[in-house]
From Swiss-Prot:
Any one GO molecular-function label of the UniProt entry: cyclic pyranopterin monophosphate synthase activity
Pathway: Cofactor biosynthesis; molybdopterin biosynthesis
Residue positions of the active site: D130
Enzyme class: lyase
Species of provenance: Bacillus cytotoxicus (strain DSM 22905 / CIP 110041 / 391-98 / NVH 391-98)
Taxonomic lineage: Bacteria, Bacillati, Bacillota, Bacilli, Bacillales
GO annotation terms (biological process): Mo-molybdopterin cofactor biosynthetic process
Reactions that this protein is recorded to catalyse: (8S)-3',8-cyclo-7,8-dihydroguanosine 5'-triphosphate = cyclic pyranopterin phosphate + diphosphate
Family listed: Belongs to the MoaC family.
Family annotation (Gene3D superfamilies): Molybdopterin cofactor biosynthesis C (MoaC) domain
Name of the protein this chain belongs to: Cyclic pyranopterin monophosphate synthase
UniProt function note: Catalyzes the conversion of (8S)-3',8-cyclo-7,8-dihydroguanosine 5'-triphosphate to cyclic pyranopterin monophosphate (cPMP).
Residue numbers binding substrate: M75, C76, H77, M115, E116
Amino acid sequence: MSSFTHFNDQGRAKMVDISDKKVTVRTAIACSSILVTKEIYDKISHHEIGKGDVLGVAQIAGIMAAKRTSDVIPMCHPLLLKGVDVSFDWKQEKKQYRLLIEVKVKTEGSTGVEMEALTAASMTALTVYDMCKAVDKGMIIGETYLLEKTGGKSGDYLRNS
């Protein structure tokens, strides 16, 4: 494992200089989820949530979050993203439903897009919670994790199941 590079000679935080890093295509896929009641699942599926199209709004929120990651993660470099795709899948679990969220982010640059994908997945889940909390505040946001990344000096990564 490499040493941390986000500290200067005085031990204080710094943004890493990436100007000498090779420009390559970089991708990242992050996942999150939110567990909801059958009532919320039905209301989302039938577009009966008062705040509007939950999945449509959450998808846009995820894309916006990916684009603004450097505004909320202090040492994250601002990146020109080439693409962001937020997708959903439902999984029934006993009497509840889990909304699975997957975010794919792509750029061509000197640093990776893992944080953008993770931020987008998190914000997508938070947006679903916000839009549905009037129905039930007991929703549970699940684990958020990096599934895969490609490109860059550290090489490719694929999470073990």
